[in-house]
Amino acid sequence: MNLAWKEIKFYKFRFILIMFIIFLMAIMVLFISGLAQGLARENISIFDQIKGNQFVVQKMKEPQLEKSILSRSKQDNISKIIDEKPFKMAGKTFKINGNEENVMAINSVKNHQPNLKSGHYPKNGNQIAINEKLTAEGLYLDDKVKVKGDDTTYKVVGILKNTMYSHSNIVMMDQSKIEQSSNVATFYVTNQLSKSDKNKINHIKGVQTATTDDITSNIASYKAEQTPLDMMIISLYIITAIVLSAFFYVMTIQKTSEIGILKAIGITTKHLLTSLILQISMITFIGVAIAEVVIFLISQILPVSMPFHIDMHNIIIVLVVFMIVGLIGTSLSFIKLIKIDPIEAIGGGQ
């Protein structure tokens, strides 16, 4: 540890430069990760909010909430098995400040209500609660809004916390207003579903159970967006490994004579390798930690309309992966350090 720290202090500029490169790479990875998570949440954040992991929907090859049509008789049969009220979902078009905004309207179901950021849930047919992203369009608490094809003027009484589905803002309104739409989807959400109940539901003609993963995997925009973004993140990790490999290999070559002298006076190869690993770990940790602080501060000032989300889970993953990538990227330096002959390094072999 002492040797590693002394070398960092002696070659300050070199190590600051490497740390700056790591910082920039970490910023890029974290920002793209934040965008990937933000876009993902615009597709599936509703599932975090409605507090359920089992769904009862219309039987179809690729279950989708907005396409689940359940007749009254099917709903009656389902209600005999599970003690849950159904969700109703329909597309609506809001008129906001002269612009049209497509949203997905859902009703309020006890124990499965999305979390509120402010205000309260609708209490009558003239009240609505909107997703927080709609505030970026100029819609706030106590504002009035019209819906295309509906004469009712709705009052905004609540702001829902990050509730979206398939890139559509979720708006909570009275069930009777949703059922006025031409295409109304119906589905059930539950936390507890025994094997026996699941079998009973699946035996109802035209009805099936599905998990959250089943639903999310069939959201077209979710699949289309995540794959290229994940590939970009992996590519950045590979580039980071290559850059660190080049930096540390060149530095090891430049220090050949010093390493030879250290070996000649009795410093073991194991000690030198430990010193190199500590150097890599320290500068990688510091560079990534600074990048994470910067990204966190940036995330606090980004507008609500920006699809960006970073949490502690992402931060820890990026830090761990960078530490591993840093060590992998400097494997060439390990090989070079092991092969350095002290006599040749100090010119004794001439």
From Swiss-Prot:
The gene is hrtB. Part of the ABC transporter complex hrt involved in hemin import. Responsible for the translocation of the substrate across the membrane. Its main location: membrane. It comes from the Bacteria. InterPro entries: ABC-4/HrtB_transporter (IPR051125), ABC3_permease_C (IPR003838). It is found in: Cell membrane. Keywords: Cell membrane, Membrane, Transmembrane, Transmembrane helix, Transport. The chain crosses the membrane at residues 15-35, 233-253, 276-296, 315-335. The keyword Transmembrane helix applies. GO terms for cellular component: plasma membrane. It is a multi-pass membrane protein. Belongs to the ABC-4 integral membrane protein family. HrtB subfamily. Coiled coil: none annotated. This is Putative hemin transport system permease protein HrtB. The complex is composed of two ATP-binding proteins (HrtA), two transmembrane proteins (HrtB) and a solute-binding protein.
